[in-house]
């Protein structure tokens, strides 16, 4: 796949690449398919970052994920918390892959004098989101549960977890 990515970048000569690509999913998908989340996300980042470098792309912006920070990080999360504790087990493979992308940008910057960066968006949701109960993220799953419960006149909704995590969300 790197050849296709490299050829696309070579042919189109972008000044900036913003990497929003990734294999994503909810708790169930992350638990059941950790190798796919790890391998596919590392491949996406490696292919894009390496091809950007080889084709002299000046600006590369990588989207990270808040899940790269330790499970027990204090709120609000600070960049300095990275790699200071254990990751959440339910999405550890995805988190490790996103850490690899962040570190790749740092290493390309130091070794090759690039200015690649990683930004951490909050949880995004909106039109065309994934509402599959086995693969969706927290907010689309919650929205679907509310709608389904309303249809069936149910008075309660099951939400996984302890209720303690804090999340930032943005409608897109």
Protein language model features and the residues they cover:
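NAD(P)H-binding glycine-rich loop region in Rossmannoid oxidoreductase-like domains
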Residues: 1-41
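Conserved mid-core alpha-helix of short-chain dehydrogenase/reductase
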Residues: 4, 43, 47-51, 104, ...
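Catalytic Tyr-X3-Lys loop
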Residues: 14, 34-46, 50-53, 57, ...
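Conserved Rossmann-fold NAD(P)-dependent oxidoreductase catalytic core, especially the SDR/UDP-sugar
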Residues: 19, 46-91, 117
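Active-site loop/turn elements of alpha/beta-hydrolase fold enzymes
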Residues: 22, 65, 121-124
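NAD(P)-dependent short-chain dehydrogenase/reductase
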Residues: 72-81, 103-172
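Active-site helix of classical SDR
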Residues: 93, 97-100
């Amino acid at each position: 796949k790197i050849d296709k990515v490299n050829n696309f970048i070579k042919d189109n000569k972008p000044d900036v690449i913003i990497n929003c690509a990734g294999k994503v999913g909810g708790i169930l998908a992350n638990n059941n398919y950790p190798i796919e989340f790890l391998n596919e996300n590392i491949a996406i980042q490696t292919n894009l970052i390496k091809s950007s470098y080889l084709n002299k792309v000046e600006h590369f912006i990588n989207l990270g994920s808040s899940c790269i920070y330790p499970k027990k990080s204090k709120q609000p999360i600070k960049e300095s918390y990275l790699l200071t504790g254990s990751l959440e087990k339910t999405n550890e493979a995805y988190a490790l892959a996103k850490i690899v992308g962040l570190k790749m940008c740092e290493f390309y910057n130091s070794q090759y004098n690039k200015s690649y960066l990683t930004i951490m968006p909050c949880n995004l949701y909106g039109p065309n989101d994934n509402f599959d109960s086995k693969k969706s993220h927290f907010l689309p799953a919650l929205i679907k549960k509310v709608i389904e419960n309303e249809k069936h006149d149910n008075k309660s909704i099951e939400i996984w977890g302890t209720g303690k995590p804090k999340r930032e969300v943005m409608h897109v």
